[in-house]
């Protein structure tokens, strides 16, 4: 009888353990299936265009950048969002002078970021509460051109940050002052974009939050109200709040690099840019105690660091307020910042 009880108990523990482990291993839903175009809030508004208007591509009229807010590489081209010049520019290398770059679009009012899935390019037109959609085409000379083909108007209050997440096959566009996230998708056989869902963090309505970061099945919102918020990516249920000191409350971006969270800070809680810096911390809980490392001296300091992006094995930091230093490049090896270079 005892042997039978032990056998049943052992079997129960084995099955419970297997279920528990399987549950933990599959806590995140499977990668998104292709979108079928049937379930959506609204579809994009189509923009008229004539390829004949793109026989000549304008070059960048500016010899310097004015508050560059984002740099990335999409396909074989580098793109810079030149925010205060109201344009996105592109080029095939980072060594040529800026006046050789070409203008992708200047139909923006203070755009901040650009994202692509290889088929469409989405840009947040911040002050117009608009998402601009562009597509890559060829003009009659066979030259690659970028053409505005669609748009979404009335997108929240100052959409400020947009990314494409391959796992969920979704573009996420954050409305920086309404606490809303707008999700966009398209079908495999068409570039027509659909607004498929709007999620929100109600406590961030009316709070200026500049960006977010997706890490697996979690999404992190940088501090706009003295807290970094961690939420479930799929439901936006708030899971954790990480208080931060007033001196670093006006954050811009959070990026996980090896064992540290790197965070760019624009202002303190009162909006004073004299507190602008770049910090890093291993555990977000340590921020409340002031246990973080200021690493801005690696980039001279004195400006306002903005966005962090990764291209191949290097990271890129944009900044402003420091003449002659708008974009930096660096590596991180064994948690050490190395090979720092001024790009533009």
Predicted regions and their residues:
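Loop/turn-rich, solvent-exposed surfaces of beta-rich toroidal or solenoidal domains
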Residues: 246-292, 306
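Structural motif
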Residues: 87-90, 129-135, 178-185, 225-232, ...
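A short helix->beta-strand "capping" segment at the edge of beta-propeller domains
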Residues: 31-66
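Surface loop/turn motifs at the tips and blade-to-blade linkers of beta-strand repeat domains
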Residues: 59-64, 102-107, 150-156, 198-205, ...
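Repeated scaffold domains used in trafficking and secretory/extracellular systems
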Residues: 66-70, 109-115, 156-164, 205-215, ...
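Blade-level signature of beta-propeller repeat domains, shared across WD40, Kelch, NHL, RCC1
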Residues: 302-344
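Conserved beta-strand positions in repeat-built beta-propeller and related beta-rich domains
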Residues: 80-84, 123-127, 166, 172-177, ...
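Beta-strand-rich domains and repeat architectures in extracellular enzymes and scaffolds
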Residues: 55-86
């Amino acid at each position: 009888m005892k042997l039978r009880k032990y056998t049943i108990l052992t079997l129960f523990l084995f099955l419970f353990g297997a279920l528990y482990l399987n549950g933990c291993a599959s806590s995140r839903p499977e990668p998104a299936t292709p979108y079928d175009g049937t379930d959506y809030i609204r579809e994009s508004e189509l923009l008229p265009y004539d390829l004949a208007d793109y026989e000549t591509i304008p070059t960048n009229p500016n010899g310097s950048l004015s508050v560059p807010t984002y740099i990335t590489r999409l396909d074989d081209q580098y793109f810079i969002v030149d925010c205060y010049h109201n344009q996105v520019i592109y080029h095939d290398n980072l060594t040529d002078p800026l006046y050789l770059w070409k203008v992708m679009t200047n139909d923006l009012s203070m755009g901040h970021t650009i994202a692509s899935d290889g088929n469409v390019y989405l840009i947040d037109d911040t002050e117009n509460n608009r998402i601009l959609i562009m597509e890559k085409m060829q003009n009659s000379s066979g030259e690659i051109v970028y053409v505005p083909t669609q748009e979404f108007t009335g997108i929240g209050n100052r959409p400020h940050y947009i990314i494409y997440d391959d796992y969920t096959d979704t573009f996420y566009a954050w409305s920086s002052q309404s606490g809303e996230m707008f999700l966009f998708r398209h079908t495999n056989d068409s570039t027509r974009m659909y607004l498929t869902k709007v999620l929100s963090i109600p406590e961030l309505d009316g709070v200026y939050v500049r960006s977010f970061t997706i890490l697996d099945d979690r999404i992190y919102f940088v501090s706009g109200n003295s807290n970094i918020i961690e939420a479930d990516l799929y439901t936006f249920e708030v899971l954790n709040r990480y208080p931060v000191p007033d001196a670093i409350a006006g954050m811009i971006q959070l990026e996980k690099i090896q064992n540290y969270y790197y965070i760019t800070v624009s202002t303190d809680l009162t909006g004073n840019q004299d507190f602008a810096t770049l910090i890093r911390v291993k555990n977000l809980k340590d921020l409340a105690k002031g246990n973080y490392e200021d690493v801005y001296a690696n980039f001279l300091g004195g400006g306002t660091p903005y966005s962090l992006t990764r291209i191949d094995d290097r990271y890129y930091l944009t900044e402003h307020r420091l003449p002659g230093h708008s974009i930096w490049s660096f590596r991180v090896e064994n948690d050490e910042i190395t090979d720092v270079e001024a790009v533009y």
